[in-house]
Each structure stands twice: as structure tokens, then as C-alpha cells.
From Swiss-Prot:
GO molecular function: ADP binding; ATP binding; phosphoglycerate kinase activity
PANTHER family the record matches: PHOSPHOGLYCERATE KINASE, PHOSPHOGLYCERATE KINASE 1, CHLOROPLASTIC-RELATED
Subunit structure: Monomer.
Protein name, per record: Phosphoglycerate kinase
Protein family (similarity comment): Belongs to the phosphoglycerate kinase family.
Superkingdom of the organism of origin: Bacteria
Source organism per UniProt: Caulobacter sp. (strain K31)
Ligand binding (ATP): K201, E323, G353, G354, D355, T356
Claim: Transmembrane helix is one of the keywords in the record: no
Signal peptide: none
Protein keywords: ATP-binding, Cytoplasm, Glycolysis, Kinase, Nucleotide-binding, Transferase
Length: 396
């Protein structure tokens, strides 16, 4: 996809409206995880160093088009200022005279944060008039919030079509990584899709089987595929009503030349709790009272061999109930092997989705993957092959 890049922009003295994701977790008015603030720092610093007036647009929570004082972004200004090591001015609105006054007072290289864009109903309606009001305070637009790119909102889509628009540095890095994983990957490509339900990942599976050489299915959704293949999964989580759909995906994979890797052995227990008695069984030997909670060692060995044979890995969803040891072993083994291959340059390893990020953190390897996306819904919709409005609006 062709985009303008910030290094080609004339920035000195220009007002740069920058869409960031500051929808941070908060407890008692304090930010408990500042990852999203830190993700925006390179773009803010770059623009500031080039003499731009940096004006930050963001949403927080779901005020539904009304001013809700406890959903104000005012609390972000001070921690952001500390991270940047420079003052951050706060405007009590994102449009109108209050916003204009703060921007007018900025010196070149200065930074301002506007109030929650979702305090205006026009934001989530992608309203052209509201976008035009936002645009009054900018000479150019930068979107650095890939995590909000699947939403066609005024600050992510309509605004990008009014001003000269650019992806921010974090957005560009995400787009480059995703292109390397699915857009234009080195083959063979292996996908790992885990999680509990087939029903939540139907579009994902249908899209991936047409693009991958191998697809390993794990987690609770693997039970549905085993059930569809007339294999008894005992007392395991299983969407029996999705059996026909699972068979359709098996047929789609066969037609596309994608090799499906389903569990051949599993780790079972009678309940999900730490320290419970766990057993490894061949999938054909699962007992009526067994609950499948992880992939077995033979299944993992097959998966690692597929990794060794691949040049690209894309991963979404854990292979078992990784939060409860010992049912984390398959996920941890696969994650560590992928990280080792990525670190040595043998594979491009891209992962994303909330549970996946948590699983890689649990395995202690998220820093060794080529790229780990924290974008959640946007990452999933991209994997499903859907157009992301906030990305397509940036195309030249």
C-alpha cells in the first residue's frame, strides 16, 4: 500500500494533528500500564524535533458522545509530560475556541493534548462537519493508532481525507510487520490459531487457509475440529453445532493446499486448577470424564517441525489453558522455539491478540518475536482480510 512518509513532510512550524491510542488501563485515577503512552513517544519526539506543533487526539473509554468528567483525558498530560521530558499543554475541548487557544499558544516543537474526541457524537458517527472542525487546528494529519484503525471514526478516517495524511512511526512499523507476515511473506508460511471457540474466528480461519502453507489449530477450538472428525472429546469444551463449519474449513484448506495440523495427542484432566492430576492421551483414547486442556508432546513436536520448515509464522491464540500450569506447556514450548528461530533470523514471527500477547509474556519471549501487535480488534480484522478504514484513508 502506498503511503506518504513523515521524512518527506515539511514539518517546521506546522500544526500536526496526531491520532494516538491513549485508552490506557486506570485504577483510582492512576495509569496502571503506560505501554500505549510509550508507543506514541517516537512519533511525538520526531515531530517535535523537526519543529512541528504536535497536537494529540485520542479517545478514552465510551462516553457515547457526551461529556463525562470521569472519562476526561486530563489525567494523561502529566505522565506523558514526564515520559517526554517536556511540558504537555491540555485543552479542555478538541474543537472550538478552547482548542484553538491552546494550539495558538504552542511554540514550534511544543506538545498539546486535546480532550477526549468521544465527548462529541460526531466522532463515532464519522461526521464530516466534526472532522472539519478538528482539521481547523492542523496543517497535516498523522495516525499513530493502528489499534483504532478498524473503526471509521472522524479522528481516524474522515479527518485523514481532509488534511495531507501520514502513518506515524508506530503505525508504519505495524503495517510493515503485517505486510511481511501475510501481505508479501517469505514462504512457507505457518499460522497458529488457538483460543476457545471456532465461532469467534470463522472469518479468520476462512481467510488464512487461502494464504498459508500450514495451519495449526489449538486451544478449545481444536476440540470442535476433532469432534467434526468423529473423535470423542469427552467432557471438553466443544461447539458441537459448529461441526459442519469445521468440516467446511477442512475442505477449504485441502482445496487451497494448506496443510491443517490438528492435535494427535492431548493433555487432559478432570478439572481446571493448578496441581490437578493431568494425563497425556492419544486423541482416540480420551475418556468420557476427560477435559482436554492442552496439546500433547507429539502434537507440539509436529508443530515445531513445521516451524523449522517455515520462513514466516503468524500466531493468534494460545494452544491450551496457559494461565493454569501445567496446561501452559505446549504454548510455552512453541513460543520459545519460535522466539529462538526469530532471534537467529530463520523465521519472521508475528503475533497478536490479547490472549496471545499475555501467553508470550508468560513464556518470557515477547521481546524476541519479530513483531508483537497489541492492537487487538484491528489486528484480528486485518488477519481476516478486512479493509481497515483508518489505514485505507492514509493511502495516497
Amino acid at each position: 500500500m502506498p503511503f506518504r512518509t513523515l521524512d518527506t513532510a515539511d514539518l517546521a512550524g506546522k500544526r500536526a494533528l496526531v491520532r494516538v491510542d491513549f485508552n490506557v488501563p486506570v485504577d483510582g485515577g492512576k495509569i496502571t500500564d503506560d505501554t500505549r503512552l510509550r508507543a506514541a513517544l517516537p512519533t511525538i519526539r520526531y515531530l517535535s524535533s523537526k519543529g512541528a506543533k504536535v497536537v494529540l487526539l485520542a479517545h478514552f473509554d465510551r462516553p457515547k458522545g457526551k461529556v463525562v468528567p470521569e472519562m476526561s483525558l486530563a489525567f494523561v498530560a502529566e505522565p506523558l509530560s514526564k515520559l517526554l521530558e517536556q511540558p504537555v499543554a491540555f485543552a479542555a475541548d478538541c474543537v472550538g475556541p478552547q482548542a484553538r487557544a491552546v494550539v495558538d499558544a504552542l511554540e514550534n516543537g511544543g506538545v498539546a493534548l486535546f480532550e477526549n474526541v468521544r465527548f462529541h457524537a460526531g466522532e463515532e458517527k464519522n461526521d464530516a462537519d466534526f472532522a472539519a472542525q478538528l482539521a481547523e487546528n492542523g496543517d497535516l494529519y498523522v495516525n499513530d493508532a493502528f489499534s483504532a484503525a478498524h473503526r471509521a471514526h472522524a479522528s481516524t478516517e474522515a479527518l485523514a481525507r481532509i488534511l495531507p495524511s501520514y502513518p506515524g512511526l508506530a503505525m508504519q512499523r505495524e503495517l510493515d510487520a503485517l505486510d511481511a507476515a501475510l501481505g508479501n511473506p517469505k514462504k512457507p508460511v505457518l499460522g497458529i490459531v488457538g483460543g476457545s471457540k471456532v465461532s469467534t474466528k470463522l472469518d479468520l480461519l476462512r481467510n488464512l487457509v487461502t494464504k498459508l502453507d500450514y495451519l495449526a489449530i489449538g486451544g478449545g477450538m481444536a476440540n470442535t475440529f476433532l469432534h467434526a472428525a468423529k473423535i470423542d472429546v469427552g467432557a471438553s469444551l466443544c461447539e458441537a453445532d459448529m461441526a459442519d463449519t469445521a468440516l467446511q474449513i477442512i475442505d477449504l484448506a485441502a482445496a487451497a493446499g494448506c496443510k491443517l495440523l490438528l492435535p494427535t495427542d492431548v493433555v487432559v484432566a478432570h478439572e481446571v486448577k493448578p496441581g490437578v492430576a493431568a494425563y497425556t492421551r492419544n486423541v482416540y483414547e480420551v475418556q468420557p470424564e476427560d477435559r482436554i486442556l492442552d496439546a500433547g508432546p507429539d502434537t507440539v513436536a509436529t508443530l515445531l517441525a513445521a516451524m523449522d520448515a517455515s520462513q514466516t509464522l503468524i500466531w493468534n491464540g494460545p494452544l491450551g489453558v496457559f494461565e493454569v500450569p501445567p496446561f501452559d506447556e505446549a504454548t510455552v514450548s512453541a513460543a520459545k522455539h519460535a522466539a529462538k528461530l526469530a532471534k537467529s533470523g530463520k523465521i519472521v514471527a508475528v503475533a497478536g491478540g490479547g490472549d496471545t500477547v499475555a501467553a508470550l509474556n508468560h513464556a518470557g519471549v515477547s521481546g524476541d518475536f519479530t513483531f508483537v501487535s497489541t492492537a487487538g480488534g484491528a489486528f484480528l480484522e486485518w488477519m481476516e482480510g478486512k479493509t481497515l478504514p483508518g489505514v485505507s484513508a492514509l493511502e495516497v
